[in-house]
Amino acid sequence: MRPYQQEAKDSIFSAWEECDNVLFQMPTGTGKTRLFSSIISDIKAWSTLHSFDCRILIIAHRIELIDQISENLQRYRIPHGIIAGGRERDLRQYVQVASIQTITHHANVDAISELDIRFIIIDEAHHSVANSYRKLWKMFEGAKILGVTATPWRMNGSGFYPLYDRLITSKPIKEFISEGWLSPYNFYSVKSQSLEVQTISNINEFDIEGDYKVSALEKEMDTMQIRARLLDSYLRLAKGKKGIIYSISRKHSEHIREEYKQAGFKVVTIDANTPRDERRLYVQRFKNGLIDIIVNVDIFSEGFDCPDIEFIQLARPTRSLVKYLQQVGRGLRPTEGKTTCIILDNVGSCLKFGLPNEERSWEEFFMGKPEKEQTDHKNYEASFGLGTKEIDYTEGSDELCLVDGVENPPSNPENKTPAWNDADDDLLRVLFVEKGCSINLLASVFKTKEVVIKDILKRKGLFTEC
């Protein structure tokens, strides 16, 4: 466990002593799955010690998230069952990972309610104010509930209280970056007078959640001129780097893919209709460097775990702070050799929501903040010096400008491990306990200081100084 994860866990257990329903905010890329895996292990250890049958339910709303949670639980050797669609169920396991749609379906409610669930963990908990989630509180009355999200925010301004009794927030993104836990970035955006922003401002068709209608976005934003400007900004600012482009729809993805493919790049598209095995193959090939760019439709907004992303390009306008921060957050996972992530905001989202590292009033959003009172950042060009570094487009008079960035990434702080990821915990244990590797050798393997290795081993109960 990283120090901030241990602090978070302690805060959550302390809050549970005073109330039942806790919402925890933690930025994308900072290891929430590792956190709640550790929470599950502690609950299981306590229940075993006290001979108490304590069942735990983990809830997600998409099959991709369920699969990812299951894979992580396997990595941490936590036996579990899955309750999702037509998948085979093993209700004997004390941990169950469930789809919210399946577990609240009327055909399953009676059987599931008999499981005597004592703890519930809700992933991507910004969705949990929906009616389908509220059924959980009725089905498992008296259970301790933990909601985990990077963004406790609702587009309509409705809050999370009193559904949740308390909000616990982690440190802001700016601190995670300065301490080396998240990657620095260079953020480029179009100006408020750009063609893209002016086009978006004229769209007045919205879906049931309040975001732009896909059909309206396709009509206005999927044009040859705007797509050419996407490619142009990539060529000028991120050429040769691998990353993710967020698109509007399948059709928009295909159009973008063709533009980049003709420019000589290895590009694939992924959406909800892409078969799971094919999707995993693409992601693996991306990690191995066989694919340069993945163009996707919302699939990688939630739950995509790949630290190798060197650039993010926003080609899909949104009115959702949740989507915006999740999308840019995918590029902030640190990895060896990665100095910065390049973020290309070709739709001007930062003008509405601010930069990723801005400190936000999560407590206000938790209690409820009307949409009309939510901050709009139209003055970023003045307040952040937009235009100090300008790049002219080959066509038109608009510019993509550096809004925020770092000249020199922060050095590795004392006793920190910036590129450490959750899989390293298992590898460290195997090398130290099973293979008998020395502290000196482990420090060399993990490219860090001996004191860092000792500190991690001490926290895991594997090492004591004589």
Outline where the language-model segments fall.
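Post-DEXD/H (motif II) to motif III coupling segment of the RecA-like Helicase ATP-binding lobe
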Residues: 127-187
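Conserved pre-motif I regulatory segment
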Residues: 1-23
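Conserved interdomain linker/interface between the two RecA-like ATPase lobes of SF2 helicase motors
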Residues: 167-244
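Conserved Walker A/P-loop ATP-binding site and its immediately adjacent core
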Residues: 53-73
